[in-house]
């Protein structure tokens, strides 16, 4: 699962553990200004591990690839806007192709785990309907198309599925 350290992905992690999943979390450093979330992700995983939950955590550094993407979240030349989540100025926080990149990495990891361990793998993401207005890569049609592309482009895709429990609700 993708674990940003924010509220959505952290609640998803807790849900997956409650449902009995063996969880590997992946956090991404991509040049984001709000790296405090990565620190919170690490703290939360450490706390869960101290309570005997089996949670693995990997941090993948994509700063050299994504750090120059034009977005208020990554570009030092403009401020992160404040305001209501659905306001137009919040579109400045879109990082081009971010969820496709993250999902592609997770999918490759899932295929590798599936092949090594001869098992099915679920890729879980905390994207939710509240993100739809601002982030086009948080919409159901995006993930349907992405899943189709991954299935067409990879062998053994029948062993991989996406779990997007919040995509239709808040």
Where are these regions (language model features)?
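ATP-dependent adenylation/nucleotidyltransferase module used to activate substrates
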Residues: 1-170
């Amino acid at each position: 699962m993708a674990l940003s350290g924010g509220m959505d992905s952290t609640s998803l992690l807790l849900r997956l553990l409650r449902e009995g999943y063996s969880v590997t979390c992946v956090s991404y450093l991509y040049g984001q200004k709000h790296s405090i979330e990565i620190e919170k992700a690490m703290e939360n995983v450490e706390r869960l591990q101290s309570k005997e939950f089996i949670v693995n955590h990997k941090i993948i550094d994509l700063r050299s690839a994504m750090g120059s993407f034009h977005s208020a979240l990554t570009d030092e030349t403009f401020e992160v806007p404040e305001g209501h989540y659905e306001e137009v100025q919040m579109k400045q926080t879109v990082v081009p192709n971010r969820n496709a990149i993250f999902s592609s990495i997770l999918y490759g990891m899932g295929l590798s785990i599936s092949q090594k361990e001869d098992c099915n793998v679920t890729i879980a993401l905390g994207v939710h309907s509240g993100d739809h207005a601002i982030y086009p890569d948080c919409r159901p049609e995006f993930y349907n198309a992405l899943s189709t592309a991954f299935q067409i482009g990879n062998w053994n895709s029948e062993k991989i599925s996406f779990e997007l429990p919040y995509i239709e609700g808040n």
